[in-house]
């Protein structure tokens, strides 16, 4: 026979799971994470889908098909330049405000930091503004809730 305390704790755990499951069904079974926004506008599923395709065509060759970046991305290459960083939660993209991400993508790193030698090209003559927004929407949509929340706060404190 099991001790009474074990039976009571097991019963309480099962009851808690039943309550959680009932609440999840009542809410449609989905857990809501912070909504993805970009430059103050809500991001749609279409934005993310378009951005995923544009990312694959224009960004993945350097930043990785899975947003993983280049190996040893924090260590300078022999030419003194930095490898392409990851855009997933292991990188630092989510530390930057939307406006900064948009500007770096549009103008390239050298356009934002004159004199900084980088392999990151400017995309303003390659992609339309809406396409750059879609790429950033896709990247942001892949981040876990913690990174999205942090980045939303950074963006809010940046005034945009």
What are these regions (language model features)?
Residues 47, 55, 97, 101, ...:
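Stable alpha-helical elements in mature extracytoplasmic
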Residues 12-21:
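Core hydrophobic alpha-helical membrane-spanning segments
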Residues 33-34, 114-160:
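Flexible coil segments in periplasmic/lumen-exposed cytochrome c-class electron-transfer proteins
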Residues 52, 68-102, 122-127:
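Gly/Gly-Pro-rich "capping" loops immediately C-terminal to redox-active cysteine motifs
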Residues 45-47, 52-83, 106-116, 142-149:
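Periplasmic/extracellular electron-transfer cofactor-ligation site
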Residues 25-54, 149-160:
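Electrostatic cytochrome c docking/interface patches
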Residues 1-13:
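N-terminal Sec-pathway targeting helices
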